[in-house]
């Protein structure tokens, strides 16, 4: 009874509790989500967020056909990407998201929008590119068009084409083609099959305009493709001769048809090679030659070399080669070439005589002659040719055939000779005088000879007659009776005075040869006298010029000349008579040089009078005229001897006279009238070096700056008293320590003064740091070796300037090492510099920073990491920014600067480099590389230790810090119903590396269960292996989709398995085309002959899509039937049945067996139910009787016991709410009344909400409370037993042990 009341209170409370629970709900924005398609698998996609007013724990989930893209963490709602997204395949889809508390589940449909990313490179369509174009294709024409497709959208899907390379790679072909934005390739220059190239290969590339990919602006480019362009030759070129020049020779007596030479021409268009026809379009000798179709030039008529002498014995042929077909312009394609044929000589002519002069001879018959005339003077000298003889011998043959000999014959042949005696071709013939005595006009006036010309080979000859006429000559001269005539005449006689008129010459010749003409031959005095040409009288021509003192005797030659210009002469000796007409003449000039102090003057004045010697006209007297210095000298009046009276001093003479003393001497004769002459005697007193130079100062001090080459240091000045430049010229010289650093150059000022300019050479400068003071000695001396010298001290002080650049200390530039990622701070190095200048102000400057990674310049990445202070301290600026993976070597290029350096000098040192090596620390965790793959497992085909999936990872650290080791953390199998089953030891992973990428190969350890349907989720960990410090790791989850045996499809063929195996590739291709899946063929076997009716063999295969789903047999059948081409091909290959006939028969038998078994089970259940119903009805009736008896007995209970209402089945507690009078036992109790005497559940009702029963009997409750723990509850006693037991307890005061009953019959539950 207590259980009944407890149930009555608990059941309404439970209903109220359930009714009061509020369902959770998603947030308002949980309707759609936008995800980029390049989101990595395993990355967080979004969160499912819901709220529950009851604050119950929430569980999140996702379902629907596309739910496989995501993995939901049920407790947190985190959604990670489980399968890669692809905008181009599925840009939007829906999933059903759910959230539930312990009582209610709420679902909502969510729209997933995939955002496009630039993950696809352009792909060229129909990549087998080749074309042919004519070489005459106009520039700008479209050669070919290509198309590249980019599946991406927007700018990432817009394609730009480019030509990367043109083969052959020449200067002409580089820009021969260009590609337009639409993919059209346009000809950009002219083509030539023959002159350029007959084939081009273009390397093409297509790139998109770029877009975001993995959060980086990325430009995707296609793989290069190649376009082959063949240039088709066109007939646009003329033929070409294979040689640039043709020549040959042929004898002039060659017979007709003789082959001379062969010409050859080919079509200029090598790709066409049109046949060529030859012809002679022009010939300098038409008809002599012709040409055949084979290009052979032959003799076509008689040849005569002598007709070609003006043409250099050659015949010029213009040979034309014409192509058989017209060119592209409708014109004949032809080319011409000149062929030279030289005609060789044959000896077929004899020499002939011609009256002409070379080279004007034409050798025509009109010029041919055999009689010639000439003239010559009598007694002409030997080898004198005959005048007016124009004889030419000509033999038109060549070489030895044209060689001939000349000789003389006839009556006068001994007096003459012929020239030349031998000649080739042609020659001018001369007849020369051989014996002069035989050529005499007085003996004969004309002579005759024969000239014979004989061919040297054939001995054929010709003869010509030459008549020679002699000319008379003047062979007598005029003669004088005497060879010498002596004559006299006074000097200065009047013009026209006769000297003589008695001298005459005679000539025995008569006529013109005997007429005499007189003349004075040019010579001494011929201009003073003259002769009458007819009479021979000699007279004075110019008496003023007759001067005995100039010339006392004249010798003249008088010549007599006849009419033939023959002459003779005689000598005239004419003496002049003297008169006193000449003053004395002093001989020469008197310039006397004498050294001062030591030299003496002793000179005789030489004078003469041209008048006749030994007379007063020629006697002389000497007199010294007064002058400034004449008192120092004496002169003898008769002899003219001049002497000095004492020593002479140069310095006593006026310097303006430069040492010269001029004396005047008068020389006179004793004639009438007296004549005199003055002469100057110049006495030069030569200066001697008897004075030393003197400096104007006793010492000199100069100051000069260092590093100033060529500068003037100072000027010294000296004077020499000597008057001549030779003696007072001063030269300066330097000596002393460091004198080689200076140079001194003297300058003459005049009057013995000179300056010495002390300066530095142009290429020498002083260095204060080396030597600050120079003590020099300057010498002033005369060039005279006998002269002395004077010295003076010169002190040169070097003024220091800041002229030296600083230098960097090499030791301070030794490389240092700095760890990345903030491992070090502050100062890391000090750059030290020095300067020898005393006023130096140094600072260290940073010139450049070089950032390199593995020797490659990475730009300005590291510029802010370090700084250099003016004192040379090197500091770390951005310790956190130092990244070994970006830059492993920083080179600080520094220099030292002297701020006090004087202008014009180098203020900077040479650049130095401080190498800072960045040391790697393990600061980068491994990261997985995206894999756009779907891994599918067909357990039936997978073998142990074979790769089924792979991962790739990279670590940006280096060395051991970048070595990655893969491991499998967890393997879960998610079945199709959503259940997750953990697996351990199913897969293993093996690590390998290539370059800096590590790969993990996932392999099954054992064979996989082919009956499992679902997905393996493999969690892979990648962790590095640092030398020091903790390791870093990354994880990713792979989905391995399984294809179980339920997707195994069987195709039956009418051919044996051997033929099916042979056609395996064709069958696979047809199935792939029909299904668009990957076909995995499992087995090919023959069908048992006893079981098969028609098919002979079967093929088992799986058909798997890239996303891991597979085709069932029904889906396969539909897809094959929808593709008629593939179906036709499969039928041709022997396909007869989709699915196994045996399996269908076995399935039918199995269905029949299942139906029979089902009917048997149903019949058995009906019998059991009927039996049970019968037993229970009877039991119920007996129980009611027992209950009635128990009620009666209960009324007889002892005093003090409260009587209770009768418990009648179907009444009282069996009539309470939700009581079941027939099924009043717990659902776990199937016992019947007679199995348990203590079962009294008829006295309580069963709560339909739980399995707990409520005891109404107090004693029964006490019994339960005293039961030992962990003892299974005893079956509830029947009401009657309870009553009887209670009664017995009340009577005896104790309970008896329960008797054994069959619990299976203690209930009416069915």
Curated annotation (Swiss-Prot):
Residues 1176-1310 are cytoplasmic. It holds the Pfam family Cadherin. The modification Phosphoserine is found at residues 1248, 1299. InterPro entries: Cadherin-like_dom, Cadherin-like_sf, Cadherin_CS. CDD domains: Cadherin_repeat (cd11304). Highly expressed in liver, kidney and colon. Moderately expressed in small intestine. Down-regulated in a number of liver and colon cancers. Expressed in duodenum with higher expression in enterocytes along the villus axis and lower expression in crypts (at protein level). GO terms for molecular function: calcium ion binding; cell adhesion molecule binding. Residues 1299-1310 have a biased composition (Polar residues). Residues 21-1154 are extracellular. It is found in: Apical cell membrane; Cell projection, Microvillus membrane; Cell junction. GO terms for biological process: brush border assembly; cell-cell adhesion mediated by cadherin; epithelial cell differentiation; homophilic cell adhesion via plasma membrane adhesion molecules; intermicrovillar adhesion; negative regulation of cell growth involved in contact inhibition; regulation of microvillus length. The cadherin 1 domain is required for binding to CDHR5. This is Cadherin-related family member 2. It comes from Homo sapiens (Human).
């Amino acid at each position: 009874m207590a259980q009944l009341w407890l149930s009555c209170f608990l059941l309404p409370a439970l209903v109220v509790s359930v009714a009061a629970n509020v369902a959770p709900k998603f947030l308002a924005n949980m309707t759609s989500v936008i995800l980029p398609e390049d989101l990595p698998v395993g990355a967080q996609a979004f969160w499912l967020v819901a709220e529950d007013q009851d604050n119950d724990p929430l569980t999140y989930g996702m379902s629907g056909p596309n739910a496989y893209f995501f993995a939901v963490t049920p407790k947190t709602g985190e959604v990670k990407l489980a399968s890669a997204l692809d905008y181009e395949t599925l840009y939007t889809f829906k999933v059903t998201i759910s959230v539930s508390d312990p009582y209610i589940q709420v679902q909502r449909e969510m729209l997933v929008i995939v955002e496009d990313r630039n993950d696809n490179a352009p792909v060229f369509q129909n990549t087998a590119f080749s074309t042919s174009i004519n070489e005459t294709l106009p520039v700008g024409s479209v050669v070919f068009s290509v198309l590249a497709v980019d599946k991406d959208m927007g700018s990432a899907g817009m394609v730009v084409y480019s030509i990367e390379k043109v083969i052959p790679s020449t200067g002409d072909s580089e820009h021969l083609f260009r590609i337009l934005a639409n993919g059209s390739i346009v000809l950009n220059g002219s083509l030539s099959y023959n002159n350029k190239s007959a084939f081009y290969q273009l390397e093409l590339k297509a790139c998109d305009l770029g877009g975001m990919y993995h959060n980086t602006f990325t430009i995707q480019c296609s793989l290069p493709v190649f376009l082959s362009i063949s240039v088709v030759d066109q007939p646009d070129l003329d033929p070409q001769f294979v040689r640039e020049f043709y020549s040959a020779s042929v004898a002039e007596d060659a017979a007709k048809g003789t082959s001379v030479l062969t010409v050859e021409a080919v079509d200029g268009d090598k790709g066409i090679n049109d046949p060529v026809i030859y012809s002679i379009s022009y010939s300098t000798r038409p008809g002599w030659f012709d040409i055949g179709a084979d290009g052979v030039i032959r003799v076509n008529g008689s040849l005569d070399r002598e007709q070609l002498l003006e043409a250099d014995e050659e015949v010029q042929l213009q040979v034309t080669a014409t192509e058989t077909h017209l060119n592209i312009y409708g014109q004949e394609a032809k080319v011409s070439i000149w062929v030279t044929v030289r005609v060789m000589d044959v000896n077929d002519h004899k020499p002939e005589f011609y009256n002409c002069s070379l080279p004007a001879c034409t050798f025509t018959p009109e010029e041919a002659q055999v009689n010639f005339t000439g003239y010559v003077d009598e007694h002409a000298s030997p080898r004198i040719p005959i005048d007016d003889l124009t004889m030419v011998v000509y033999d038109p043959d060549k070489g030895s055939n044209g060689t001939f000999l000349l000789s003389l014959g006839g009556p006068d042949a001994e007096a003459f000779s012929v020239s030349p005696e031998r000649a080739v071709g042609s020659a001018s013939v001369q007849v020369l005088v051989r014996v002069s005595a035989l050529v005499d006009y007085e003996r004969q006036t004309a002579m005759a000879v024969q000239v014979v010309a004989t061919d040297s080979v054939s001995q054929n000859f010709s003869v010509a007659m030459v008549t020679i006429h002699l000319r008379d000559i003047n062979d007598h001269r005029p003669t004088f009776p005497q060879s010498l005539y002596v004559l006299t005449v006074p000097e200065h006689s009047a013009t026209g005075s006769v000297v003589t008129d008695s001298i005459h010459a005679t000539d025995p010749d008569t006529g013109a040869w005997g007429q005499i003409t007189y003349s004075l031959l040019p010579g001494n005095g011929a201009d003073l006298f003259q002769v009458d040409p007819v009479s021979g009288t000699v007279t004075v021509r110019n008496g003023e010029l007759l001067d005995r003192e100039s010339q006392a005797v004249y010798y003249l030659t008088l010549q007599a000349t006849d009419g033939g210009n023959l002459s003779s002469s005689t000598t005239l000796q004419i003496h002049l008579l003297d008169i006193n007409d000449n003053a004395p003449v002093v001989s020469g000039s008197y310039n006397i040089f004498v050294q001062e102090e030591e030299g003496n003057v002793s000179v005789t004045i030489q004078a003469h009078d041209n008048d006749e010697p030994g007379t007063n006209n020629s006697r002389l007297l000497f007199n010294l005229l007064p002058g400034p210095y004449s008192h120092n000298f004496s002169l003898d009046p008769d002899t003219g001897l001049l002497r000095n009276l004492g020593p002479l001093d140069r310095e006593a003479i006026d310097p303006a006279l430069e040492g010269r003393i001029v004396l005047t001497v008068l020389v006179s004769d004793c004639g009438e009238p007296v004549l005199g002459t003055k002469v100057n005697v110049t006495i030069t007193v030569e200066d001697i070096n008897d004075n030393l130079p003197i400096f104007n100062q006793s010492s000199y001090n100069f100051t000069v700056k260092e590093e100033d080459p060529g500068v003037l240091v100072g000027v010294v000045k000296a004077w020499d008293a000597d008057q001549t430049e030779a003696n007072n010229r001063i030269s300066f010289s330097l000596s002393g320590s460091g004198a080689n650093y200076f140079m001194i150059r003297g300058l003459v000022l005049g009057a013995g003064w000179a300056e010495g300019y002390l300066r530095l050479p142009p290429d020498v400068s002083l260095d204060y740091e080396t030597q600050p003071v120079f003590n020099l000695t300057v010498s002033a001396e005369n060039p005279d070796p006998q002269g002395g010298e004077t010295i003076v001290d010169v002190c040169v002080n070097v003024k220091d300037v800041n002229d030296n650049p600083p230098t960097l200390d090499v030791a301070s530039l030794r490389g240092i090492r700095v760890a990345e990622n903030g491992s070090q701070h502050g100062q890391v190095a000090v750059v030290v510099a020095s300067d020898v200048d005393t006023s130096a102000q140094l600072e260290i400057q940073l010139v450049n920073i070089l950032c390199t990674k593995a020797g490659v310049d990475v730009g300005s990445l590291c510029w802010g990491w370090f700084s250099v202070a003016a004192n040379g301290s090197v500091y770390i600026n951005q310790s956190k920014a130092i990244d070994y993976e970006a830059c492993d070597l920083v080179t600080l290029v520094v220099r030292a600067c002297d701020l006090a350096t004087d202008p014009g000098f180098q203020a900077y040192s040479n650049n130095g480099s401080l190498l800072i090596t960045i040391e790697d620390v393990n600061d980068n965790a491994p990261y997985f590389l995206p894999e756009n793959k779907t891994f599918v497992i067909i357990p039936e085909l997978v073998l142990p230790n074979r790769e089924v999936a792979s991962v790739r990872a990279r670590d940006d650290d280096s060395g051991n810090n970048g070595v990655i080791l893969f491991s499998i953390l967890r393997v879960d199998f998610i079945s199709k119903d959503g259940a997750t089953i953990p697996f351990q030891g199913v897969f293993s992973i093996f690590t390998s590396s290539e370059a800096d990428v590590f790969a993990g190969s996932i392999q099954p350890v054992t064979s996989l269960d082919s009956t499992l349907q679902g997905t393996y989720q493999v969690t892979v960990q990648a962790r590095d292996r640092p030398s020091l410090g903790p390791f870093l790791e990354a994880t990713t989850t792979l989905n391995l989709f399984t294809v179980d045996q339920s997707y195994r499809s069987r195709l039956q063929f009418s051919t044996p398995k051997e033929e099916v195996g042979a056609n395996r590739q064709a069958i696979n291709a047809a199935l792939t085309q029909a299904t668009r899946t990957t076909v995995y063929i499992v087995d090919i076997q023959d069908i048992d002959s006893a079981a098969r009716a028609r098919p002979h063999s079967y093929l088992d295969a799986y058909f798997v899509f890239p996303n891991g789903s597979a085709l069932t047999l029904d889906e396969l059948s539909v897809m094959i039937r929808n593709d008629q081409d593939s179906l036709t091909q499969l039928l041709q290959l022997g396909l007869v049945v989709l699915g196994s006939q045996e399996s269908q028969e076995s399935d039918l038998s199995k269905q029949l067996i299942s139906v029979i078994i089902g009917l048997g089970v149903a019949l058995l259940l009906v019998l059991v139910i009927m039996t049970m119903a019968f037993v229970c009805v009877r039991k119920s009736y007996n129980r009611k009787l027992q209950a009635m008896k128990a009620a009666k007995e209960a009324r007889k209970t002892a005093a003090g016991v409260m009587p209770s209402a009768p418990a009648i089945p179907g009444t009282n507690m069996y009539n309470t709410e939700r009581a079941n009078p027939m099924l009043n036992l717990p659902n776990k109790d199937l016992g019947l009344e007679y199995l348990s005497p203590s079962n009294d559940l008829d006295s309580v009702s069963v709560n339909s909400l739980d399995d707990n029963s409520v005891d109404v009997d107090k004693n029964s409750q006490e019994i339960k409370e005293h039961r030992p723990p962990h003892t299974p509850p005893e079956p509830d006693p029947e009401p009657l037993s309870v009553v009887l037991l209670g009664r017995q307890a009340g009577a005896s005061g104790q309970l008896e042990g329960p008797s054994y009953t069959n619990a299976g019959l203690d209930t009416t539950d069915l």
